[in-house]
Amino acid sequence: MTKVLYILGDKDGGIVLCSLLCMYALLIMLGCSIPVAVFGTFAFALSSYSFIIIAAGHVIKAWAMAFMPLVLLGMTMLVKKKNKFLATLVFTVALYWHILFGHYQITYYFAFLCLALYLGYLIYSLKNGEKKELLVNSGCLLVGVLIVVLMNSPKLVSNYELGQHSIRGKSELTAQVDGKADKSSGLDQGYAFAWSY
């Protein structure tokens, strides 16, 4: 499947092209006019942040972000009552590619966006009495997520296992003795934040 991505180009231009195509498809599906879709597409794909992370070598992060609109496209197709098989296929393939790149921080935050959109759809469906449609669409999304998790499970499990031996140390969400941070493990906070932008 990843060979398909190389049609877009395995270099930096491929990331931008993928971002352009995915965002344009999403905005058209959302009902935007062509000029608005073109403007939104360029605003997303050609933002300064995209070029900063590519230039800084965060190519995996850029690829993961490029596929976010395509995942949302699959969800939108289900909500807009398009072909369920095609919508599930788009959602599953896009989510597979998104997770395949392995930038789990982006996936983590993107999951919050997807959950917020799903909760909005859930409330809307329950208010309008579309329970059967809600169950079918939820099932389609769940099947897609399960397929993607199973296909990526070796990578996800190995990442989890290696994370147990990370130099980043223990979670900051643990109890602190006398209100002071435990400096016996992990990176110094100043060092870690120096790499954030």
Predicted features by range, described:
Residues 1-23, 42-65, 177-197:
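Membrane-interface coil-to-helix junctions
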Residues 9-10, 31, 128-129:
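Short, flexible coil/linker elements and helix-boundary hinge sites characteristic
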Residues 17-30, 35-124, 137-159:
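Membrane-embedded helix bundles of polyisoprenyl
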Residues 73, 127-129, 177-179:
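Juxtamembrane/interface motifs at transmembrane-helix termini
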Residues 128-136:
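Hydrophobic, small-residue-rich membrane helices and short re-entrant helix-turn-helix hairpins
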Residues 148, 153-197:
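Periplasmic/ER-lumenal interhelical loops and adjacent helix-loop junctions
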